Amino acid sequence: MTWFIDRRLNGKNKSMVNRQRFLRRYKAQIKQSISEAINKRSVTDVDSGESVSIPTEDISEPMFHQGRGGLRHRVHPGNDHFVQNDRIERPQGGGGGSGSGQGQASQDGEGQDEFVFQISKDEYLDLLFEDLALPNLKQNQQRQLTEYKTHRAGYTANGVPANISVVRSLQNSLARRTAMTAGKRRELHALEENLAIISNSEPAQLLEEERLRKEIAELRAKIERVPFIDTFDLRYKNYEKRPDPSSQAVMFCLMDVSGSMDQSTKDMAKRFYILLYLFLSRTYKNVEVVYIRHHTQAKEVDEHEFFYSQETGGTIVSSALKLMDEVVKERYNPAQWNIYAAQASDGDNWADDSPLCHEILAKKLLPVVRYYSYIEITRRAHQTLWREYEHLQSTFDNFAMQHIRDQDDIYPVFRELFHKQNATAKG
């Protein structure tokens, strides 16, 4: 009976190396497809995998083919309608542009659909939040927030071919072959010495010489059957994510849920905050999030109530800022915490309250926070709140504001607010 042992390291995932190389090569096209696809998802389905489409012309590769010129004679099998020099009419109907797919139209009835493939949840989130970071993160006294970085960690017997260490694998191969054939080589050397003695002796010992030659051939065959490289020899460069401690941080999420915020506006605000939550939870460890909903009154809530509560009312934005100031003073010492805030609103506010918002931010919050972002979600003209905040933006480097008009603006605005900076703006 014959037994087959499958030692392939990637037996169940044989194309992993090709897949990783493909993702690296077409990262720009994939990220563009992801940024377009995220706007089509439901609020509760932001963090799953994705089907990515890439235009065919973007993945075309150089190839050798015959030129269009010259004279050629070809014989096609099964031809019983045409003879040499007959003209073949172009097929009628079904030409370019008559299909219903997403491929490009063609004048000769031929074309190619876009290349579509599936990426996993981890690949999707890695690309989604690539090159993003909390701005102005400062090393404080107490370290609880942990960011992970990849480091070399020796060698491992398992891995993907892209990480193979050729030198270490060949060293193991040499050691294995030496150990497995050392005894046979010593025996072979002894037989060869005996054969040399018998060959030069008188009278000739033909039978003994033939026996020695046969044994030598068998030993050499056994030595040659030892494989040059085996899966046991392979060693891969090992990488591991090590915690890179940094200062502890807290993110305040302030969302306007007043009556002026219609359902589509609230959905866009929720999409932004879900992206923010996924970014924080995937990139950092132990970062705290404080959720505040407000209309005429502000209330600190848990995650579920923040995203799903139906409570609504009038609009007094300063109530949320006052509550944030109270929470900071009560629980988050600025000397020990990196404090961040993201505020989303449609900009509609009681006119006399907007100057108060300016005052609270300028005197109480912006001096103690590392970064404060304001997102206004509206298609209308900006009102008093936006104009008051514009004065803050010109005064404070740690204050940023962006405008979202429709769903397609959410992801670009998010990346603009949290793109990785080369140097901290505030020490």
Curated annotation (Swiss-Prot):
Residues 79-90 have a biased composition (Basic and acidic residues). The keyword Zinc does not apply. May play a role in the adaptation to sustained nitrogen starvation. The gene is yeaH. Induction: Expression is probably regulated by NtrC, which binds to the promoter region of the yeaGH operon during nitrogen starvation. Expressed in nitrogen-starved cells shortly after sensing nitrogen starvation. It appears to be continuously expressed for up to 24 hours into nitrogen starvation. NCBIfam families: PRK05325.1-2 (NF003707), PRK05325.1-3 (NF003708). Belongs to the UPF0229 family. This is UPF0229 protein YeaH. It holds the Pfam family DUF444. Residues 92-102 have a biased composition (Gly residues). It comes from the Bacteria.
